[in-house]
Amino acid sequence: MATVGAPRHFCRCACFCTDNLYVARYGLHVRFRGEQQLRRDYGPILRSRGCVSAKDFQQLLAELEQEVERRQRLGQESAARKALIASSYHPARPEVYDSLQDAALAPEFLAVTEYSVSPDADLKGLLQRLETVSEEKRIYRVPVFTAPFCQALLEELEHFEQSDMPKGRPNTMNNYGVLLHELGLDEPLMTPLRERFLQPLMALLYPDCGGGRLDSHRAFVVKYAPGQDLELGCHYDNAELTLNVALGKVFTGGALYFGGLFQAPTALTEPLEVEHVVGQGVLHRGGQLHGARPLGTGERWNLVVWLRASAVRNSLCPMCCREPDLVDDEGFGDGFTREEPATVDVCALT
């Protein structure tokens, strides 16, 4: 299922440096173009959430300006980290950097993929081979990795975490984790996982979301532990589709919760909670509002793969809901391309 043709150049949308800036203290994503705009657009809700004094607001302004500067430097700094890691880091479990083998994958996942590429495969038959977490929300679960592979990957991630190598934040909300492309795991692990296994599966589950046109991804591991990140606020992903796999370790709490699609006015009415099962992956639409409940005890590590289809996002950026203003970027960027493949309709509200 690999994409054939010349290498493609990927971009991000310019809104990355202005929109969806997360303020954890107030549990709010904001668009930031300056002090007056921030006061005008968010003054009442900020005051209702505790930003009441002049000092509070000035502290918020400083944090937002710092975050914008961080995002502006992100591509260059990420490339520098990746180069240093490639030249200087010594893995503890070098076998996880080998090309993805079937032995790393759960038998159920291999069976689901084998069915997905069979001539007579259809959605009804596929759903008999998956756990449907929510038919209404189109959330599914399937074992992805074997227990030995999860353990080996975790050991490698912990070894890297404890090394003196530079580390980038996994995303704009989490502070602890690992960017897999910086560690050198995109080419051997994540790209084959997307191309060979996830694309045929997603093509049947989510054809209206570009499931059959996935051409890039962003993969990272997030870590939750006492004294570090404990929970994750409600958000939606910069992705058409998402795979979230629990890697371990031993923990309590931290369940995922899901609302509706972010465009819906009652998107967080009666959220659905989903417990983690080590080795199993939860599949959902990127636009599905979700978060993570507070960790109780232990450490929780999850692999998150944002799956992207330029045929969808080239016409509408999911983060600013406008036609993307393209900016050249490193690697897969945020999944946009300057060339125009045939587009598909974005996910409908269901």
Curated annotation (Swiss-Prot):
Q: How is the cofactor bound?
A: Binds 1 Fe(2+) ion per subunit.
What terms describe the molecular function in GO for this protein? dioxygenase activity; iron ion binding; L-ascorbic acid binding; oxidoreductase activity, acting on paired donors, with incorporation or reduction of molecular oxygen
- Residues that, per the record, bind Fe cation: 235, 237, 290
The alphabetized UniProt keywords are: Dioxygenase, Iron, Metal-binding, Oxidoreductase, Vitamin C
Give the protein's cofactors.
Fe(2+); L-ascorbate
The EC number of this protein is 1.14.11.-
Q: Which Gene3D superfamilies match?
A: q2cbj1_9rhob like domain
Query: Does the record carry Metal-binding as a key word?
Result: yes
One Pfam family from the UniProt entry?
A: OGFOD2-like
Where is the Fe2OG dioxygenase domain positioned along the sequence? Answer: 215-309
Indicate yes or no for the key word Nucleus: no
Per UniProt, where does 2-oxoglutarate bind? Answer: 300
Protein family per UniProt: Belongs to the OGFOD2 family.
The record's annotation in PANTHER family points to: 2-OXOGLUTARATE AND IRON-DEPENDENT OXYGENASE DOMAIN-CONTAINING PROTEIN 2 (PTHR24014:SF4)
What is the designated name of this protein? Answer: 2-oxoglutarate and iron-dependent oxygenase domain-containing protein 2
What organism does the record attribute this protein to? Homo sapiens
